[in-house]
Amino acid sequence: HRWNQKTVFYEEASKVPFIMSYNNGKQLKSEVFVQSGIDVLPTICDFAGIPIPATSKGKSLASAFTQINQVPNRDYIVVSDQLSQGAPVNGQQLNPEGRMLRNKQFKYWIYNYGTQTEVLYDIVNDPGEMVNLINDPNYTTALKNCRAQLFSWATEYKDPFIKYLVN
């Protein structure tokens, strides 16, 4: 996509493998499932046998690696992005921030700044994320569902970005 940074929501930058090594004398397994960075701390705490902080928003994934048929089932994940810029551009300090929701078929993202703040991709039929469907009337229901899921997530996790979301 010719972006000069890795803080974007395209698959090449946001679909990062989560690799964990844990040696407790048991044979662990390899699993493919969707997880979020907010799950790392609770997972490490769980493996270490220490309490998960009450302020942690994630969920432990330890059982996915140690028990049979315990892979977490999520309808979607949310990824956040905050671009930090050093020098002002035309006298204005820009620090765009965004959220991305990815479910089984669609990827929706929204930024608080820019000329195209919302994007919707059908990642099943357009895995290269080349056609923005945000204004396509055939995808109105998908867009509403993605917006509602992201709003629900932001409400649950008390995300201050909620003020930019469309519901």
Question: Model features per residue range: what roles?
Answer:
Residues 9, 18, 30, 60-63, ...:
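Conserved beta-strand positions that form and line the central face of beta-propeller blades
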Residues 26, 39-41, 46-119, 153, ...:
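C-terminal cap/loop subdomain of S1 sulfatases and analogous C-terminal strand-loop tails that border
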Residues 41, 130, 150:
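Generic structural marker for isolated residues within well-ordered, non-membrane alpha-helices
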Residues 126:
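Intrinsically disordered, low-complexity polar regions and short flexible loop motifs
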